[in-house]
């Protein structure tokens, strides 16, 4: 029988998830609208080109700046003044930008993953990186209103600038990418404060950057590999079936992902501070597990309702999506249910891996996500040409299942301490 205390925990989680959902509503809706209109403006083939270039650029930005963002969340509150953390961040940002320019220049030279405009992609990657760093600093300072404000503004400006650039430069992938770059850059410029700069390249600041890197690099690697899963799907589909079909897949899958970000992801956002704060207070595995269990159960309940509706009204749902995003290949209807299941498994995995995350077992998290990426690559490379796009959807399910099971297996001490309570 559930105690009143546990009921209060679940009610608190539902309440927090609801408010996180509201905070995600405006960016989520603009993201959903962007998928619809971007696809309409440029068509399936150009949208496919845009999608794979953006996925690659976002991936490089995550590898270049993710370690800094994770360090801000971990160490930001330990600095007595803003200037003291700014100096190491400036040094780290110089390294990050240098890495972005180098990797994108190499990719552009070898036409990997496809031919793309180097200057535009450098601007986009840099803008994404700066924007995410500013957003992370707001999160570290516990300023949720500023996070909502800047993400909402970014979502609106991204859409608005993309509208103008496609009218000015023509309806193509490059104009969309340039519009997105300005959408990330403009709100970042307004948020940058004027500070008094002293000696930046001191030994103390360099040591702090080294500390940031040692802590954040494994997490940055994890985020980068996670983004590689989406990039891998698009890369192999384009290689075997061309940009037209890849564009249809990208538009359809991103539509579903945007819906998930509004419905399911708020639970993940709500559970994260509860788990971290509980662990930081007393490292009580039993109480931490209760929060993880509540979050997982709430996600399962929400997804079960979504899945039942999708199974009953599958054809009607696909027709509704088709009316919003015309030009999507009819084959996408067979992917609806597998993509929903795969999307849920990865959201569920973000909660299941919390024991490793709170215990700072980031190397084990990286091993798990590498295994999932290997399944993705092997499945797409060997079976996609023979069986079609349904393989990509099923590799998403297989990789998500592997990640969940492997993270559980890597947490025996945590689960053992739970059962010993």
Predicted stretch roles:
Residues 15-27, 53, 58-116, 281-307:
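Membrane-water interface segments that mark the loop-to-transmembrane alpha-helix transition
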Residues 9-68, 159, 217-244, 254, ...:
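Signature of the first transmembrane helix
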Residues 54-62, 226, 249-269, 273, ...:
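Transmembrane helix-bundle signature of multi-pass secondary active exporters and lipid flippases
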Residues 16-27, 84, 88, 122-128, ...:
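Alpha-helical transmembrane segments of multi-pass membrane transporters/permeases
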Residues 92-221, 345-351, 370-371:
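Hydrophobic transmembrane helix module of multi-pass membrane transport proteins
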Residues 44, 108-121, 312-344, 390:
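Interfacial segments at transmembrane-helix termini and the short loops linking adjacent helices
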Residues 1-30, 205-222, 407-421:
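N-terminal membrane topogenesis motif
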